[in-house]
Structures are given as C-alpha cells and as structure tokens.
Amino acid sequence: MAKPLNGKQIMLNIKEIVRVTKDFIRIVPDLAVKPPSVEEPISLASILEATVSEHSDRNMIIFEGRELSWDEFNALTNQCAHALFARGISRGDAVAVIMENRIEFLTTVFALQKIGAIAGLINNSLAGPQLQHCIQVAGSKMCLVGEEVYDNFAAIRPQLGLADSAILWVADGSEGVCPEGSENFLSNVAEYPTTNLPDTATILAGDTALYIFTSGTTGMPKAAKITHRRWISGGYPAGKVGLLAKPTDRFYLCLPLFHGTGFICGLGAILYSGASMFLRRKFSASEFWLDAQQYQTTCFIYVGELCRYLLAQPVCDAEMNNPLERVFGNGLRPDIWLQFKGRFAIDRVCEFYGSSEGNVGFVNALNKDKTMGMTASTVILVQYDVDSDEIVRDAQGKMIQVKKGTPGLLLGEIDERFKFDGYTNSEASEAKILRDVIKPGDAWFNTGDLVMQIDVGFAMGLKHYQFVDRVGDTFRWRSENVSTNEVGEILNANVQVELANVFGVDVPAAEGKAGMVSLSLKAGRVFDVEEFSAYVRQHLPSFAQPVFVRIQSEASTTGTFKLVKGELRKQAYHLPEVSEDIYVMPPRGDAYQRLDEAYYQTILAGTAGF
C-alpha cells in the first residue's frame, strides 16, 4: 500500500500540475499544426525568405568576429544561387557540400535550396573510400569543397570522374590559392544579383532538399533523403514546441551542420523564430561558457556527449549566472540529467528522439526529467531477444508488445502523415520496413532502438518514453543481458574517466560476449588500476563488470559525437592489433591486470576459464 503524501509533497504535486498544464496550453496550437502536403509550395528557401521579410534588420549570425543580419545573409545566399545557376545547376540536381561550420556552408546550402537543387551534406572529417562513397552515392553533379578540408578531397578527386568546372573550391576566410583541378567559386560571386530567385516559389514540400548521411559506424554511410516536408516536420516543433524560441533568443550552435540535429533542429528553430545564432566550427568544453557569456546565448543545441564533457570540466566563474535558459537535443542520459540541469541552472531540457531517415519523432515538450518525451506518431514496442538479435514472435508468428516499464524494440507505423522517405538505396530502405505487423498490408519503420514507456508523474495523460539502448549495443554474458549504455553511465561516474565506450567481444570457449570498455581518461590522469578495480567491484554486478579494459588517449567518436564501436569491437583485446594498454579481469579475480602475451595466448586457446 502506498504511503500517504505529506504536506510538502502535496504542494510539490500541485505546483507540477499547474506548471505542466500551463506548458500544455502554451504548446497546444503548435502541436496541432500538421506538416504540409507534398504538393504544397513551401521549402527551406521560402521559409528563409519569409523570415527575412519579418526580421530583415535583426542579427542572424555571429561567426568568428563577423556578423550578418537576416537581410545580408539572404543577399549573399541569392548571389551564390545565381552563380550556381549560371554554372548549370538546376532543380533536382545533387551537389555535395563539404565544409566545416562557417557562413559559406550556410549560404551555399541555402543557395541550392533557392534553385530547388539537393545539397548533399557530407561529414567534413571523412576521407578515402567513405568520402568517395558519399559523393558518388548522392549522384553529385558538382562538389562545393572548403579550403580547410580540400586535402582529404584531393586524395579521392581522380576517382570521381568530374570535370574541373564541377569542383568548386570555397576559400576559408581569405582569398587563398585555388588548387589545380578546381575553380574558385567565390572569386566572382559578388558580381551576381542579390535578388530572390523567382523559381523558389514553385518548389514543393515533397521535393528532396538534402541528403544527410548516417554515421557509418558499422559500414559505409547511407544517404537519407530529407524532403522539405521532413525538414519542416523537425525544425518547426524544435523551435515552437521544444525551445519555445522567440526573435530575441540567441542560439549557441556548435554541432556539425552536416548532421540532422544541427541542420534540421537547430537551424529549423532559428528560422521559425527569427532568432540569431552564435556559430562555432567545433565544440570546445573549455571555451563554452566564455562564449555563452560573451554572446549572451539563451538556447543550446546539444548531443548528450557534449553535456557530459561540460560536466567533466572544473567549475569556472563563467558558468555562474550564465545566460543559458533552454537546451534542445538528444542523447542526454538519465545518469547525468539532473546534475547537468542543476549545476548549470537550465530551466528547460527538451530531449528529443528521431533520426534523419526515420518517421518516428518524440519531444519532451512538457519539460519532464529523464525522458525523450511524447509522440504524435503511431508507435509500438515489441519484444526483442538481444541474445539472438531478433524480434520475439508468438506461436502464430506475431510480434509481442511489451508492457510499461519493459524495454522493447520501437516501431513506427508508416502512413500518409508519417512517411518513410528512406535512403537513396532502395534495398537499404526496404530493409528498415517490417510488414504485416498488426494487420495485413501495414508497414512499420524499424528504428533499431530499444525504448520503454516510463512514469513521469502528471503529464496530461500523455505517454512518455525513455531511450534504453541501440539494438546490438546490448549483449549477453553469464546468462544475463548487459546494457552498454547502463554500464557506460556507471563507469563515466568514476573519478578517472572522461568517457567510457562499452561493447561486447567474443572470447573462445565462452558463451555470449564478454564486456569490454575503452576508456579515455581525464586530463592529466594516469590509470590507477587498483582504484578502478575497486570501483567496478563496488558499482557493477559480476556479470556486468567489463572483462577487458583498453586505455585510449582520445575517445573514438564520429563527427557527430556518436561513440564508434565497430573498429574497437573488431580489434577487441587482440594485442597484435592494439598499441595501447589493455587490462583483463581473470575469472574469479578481483582486480585488473595488464594483459601480456602469455595470458593472451591462453585466452585464444580457450583455456583461460571464461
């Protein structure tokens, strides 16, 4: 029987009911807004032009000492659009854009939108076969390549089969010297008109605007088709429902603009509100609060790893009385949620869930803690066997839905409102669809994520959910399921650890997968194996304790700060493939020891006793 509430608890509950009700009333009009039909004439470019007409003289962007108003930004964008059109780019053409975060990235991408062309937003850290693959899988007619990343591009330039006139070099902050085999795009852009293009008004919501690529942590990146409708479906709620953004806000934007969170959610919120942004090339934990104070940023677009990096920094004067009020992003884990919110006095943490290619979206619109929020999509959670890595079915072959509080594989129904636009590769698109799930003929998008419904208290009767794990990021050891995220959260709290990347590895003559963690240590730390061993014993059950520990000088992440596991999993504890220190917890041992060649051979022989 539940204990009766005391007076203080009753008052807190009443305050929460009042707060949630006010929040709900405030966002109801925007929740009711439906995405445009695919035939409606609306696009990123037309939304930009509407914002410019309303906020023309207001500041739009601050970048490395340079400031532009909305009107000035639009004029530069129009000049780029006229220049690209003169070079033969037309509606439906794909153009690869490879640059760091900077003003020219935005003006060229929006210039392509003005024409009705497709901008392929390519990870600027890629090189070699992955870079070549992304350019070619997008069907790129031209490439806009920044001076700062041209060396990587030059290495694969001969394999692209493009004429010199199709390689447009974009200077970075100075005139520079255009390399042989390309043309200097900015050399004569100023000669073109600053007027809007007349054809922009004819671009439809269902037209493809962008290609945004998957991270490629387990293989070659896939190009997700982002229509104008899909961009609107992400950008509008980010600003209106999530951040409650207004023209007087200033955003801190340091996420890569080639990624959906930065370009769809961040820029979408800015365009729909008329707010300004402080744009940074890359995130810096040590300079974040100095920037926030100098530029008085009120909103921040995050991924969870950035929040963890900020918490790992020593307390500084600049974080005190900081101007940040609201944050929007994904991947903020429950173990640091309240610490992040409390230490930095954040009023509103709006976690969201979604993917560039998917049709499922969640948003924490009611500002609840430790949740990715609610959804308007039709979703179900079905049983998933993490050991066999497959969906569980009943005797009739039907999927089994899980109960509240139980993790399940998240599926989103594909219908007219919540479309699945897929990838450029039709086979890859079909592989993400499950059919005949509830009734014959239905189709559902397989997110590949384990999610569970949770209790968040009073929430207007709306179901709320929490991210649990990525399928494949859960493994089985000692007949128990081990969540890499849960173990990682616990290890991240260790005094030595900057970031823990947990994964499962095969061990000869052992059932399941043994846990392994790759640790990057805090600055100035030398790995204290005794302290870490004691911490693991104290905080993790035996089956969840990593068997192997690898010490890395720097965490392995993608350009969008996602932990890279594929190569680490492949290298595992194999001494010939790893130059860094590896430690092992022997069976029935109570402390980690350095893995030497003799014990390594014992493991390979299957006689170590695991």
Place the predicted regions along the sequence by residue:
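Conserved AMP-binding/adenylation subdomain of ANL enzymes
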Residues: 232-250, 258-298
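Gly/Ser/Thr-rich phosphate-binding loop
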Residues: 187, 272, 294-302, 311-385, ...
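Conserved C-terminal "lid"/linker of ANL adenylate-forming enzymes
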Residues: 501-508, 516-520, 531-610
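Conserved pre-ATP/AMP-binding loop-to-beta segment of ANL
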Residues: 169, 190-213, 220, 244-250
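AMP-binding/adenylate-forming catalytic core of the ANL superfamily
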Residues: 126-133, 143-145, 354, 412-414, ...
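Conserved AMP-binding A3 loop
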Residues: 69-71, 201, 209-233
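Conserved AMP-binding/adenylate-forming core of the ANL superfamily
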Residues: 36-41, 45, 49, 57-102, ...
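Structural core segment of the AMP-binding/adenylate-forming
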Residues: 2-20, 86-87, 110, 114-188, ...
